Amino acid sequence: MKVNANTMRKGHILEDGGKLYVITAANIVQPGKGGAFIQLEMKDVRTGTKTSMRFRTQETVERARLDEHEMSFLFAEGDQYTFMDKESFEQVTIPGDVIGDGKVFLQDGMEVVVQSFEGAPLSVELPQTVTLRIVEADPVVKGQTASSSYKPAVLENGVRVLVPPHVDAGTRIVVNVEDGTYLERAKD
């Protein structure tokens, strides 16, 4: 289906010249002179070769028609991740490189959308946010409040994030899955 180039995001699948590409990075650039454009870093689904393309923001591109299945994450074994289709209860094992950097945020029972083309899984769309517990947080250094100060903290999955000074170990926080940043304290 044809969509505006500026709606393309990381994880989307683009069809160009009969080839399928998964977008690994999308940056909108606004130069001082001329119109804005979007720079897409992509990986060929079949060969794995990386390429980049540039489109004007008002240009249309062909987004690949994919089969989407709602699945639940079951378990990980090495770099293989097993999901269960919520309709057919069929189990599917997906390699870690298909999931991408977000695999560290997978939790038991997490609901995801698996996109596949001709039966082969191409990408896994994780929820935008995930709630995790902080297991270790540095103490607050007094007197550094002239600017917004953040301190490093380690989450239960081993990921390091920067959190505000009032957040301590044991606190549950909401994290943005796409870039791994702190959003807010969990409301539970």
UniProtKB/Swiss-Prot annotation:
GO terms for cellular component: cytoplasm. The keyword Protein biosynthesis applies. Involved in peptide bond synthesis. Stimulates efficient translation and peptide-bond synthesis on native or reconstituted 70S ribosomes in vitro. Probably functions indirectly by altering the affinity of the ribosome for aminoacyl-tRNA, thus increasing their reactivity as acceptors for peptidyl transferase. Pfam families: EFP, EFP_N, Elong-fact-P_C. It is found in: Cytoplasm. Keywords: Cytoplasm, Elongation factor, Protein biosynthesis. This is Elongation factor P. Belongs to the elongation factor P family. Its main location: cytoplasm. InterPro entries: Elong-fact-P_C, NA-bd_OB-fold, Rib_uL2_dom2, Transl_elong_fac_P/YeiP, Transl_elong_KOW-like, Transl_elong_P/YeiP_cen, Transl_elong_P/YeiP_CS, Transl_elongation_fac_P. Pathway: Protein biosynthesis; polypeptide chain elongation. Signal peptide: none annotated. CDD domains: S1_EF-P_repeat_1, S1_EF-P_repeat_2. PROSITE patterns: EFP. Gene3D superfamilies: 2.30.30.30, Nucleic acid-binding proteins. One of its GO terms (molecular function) is translation elongation factor activity. One of its GO terms (biological process) is peptide biosynthetic process. It comes from the Bacteria.
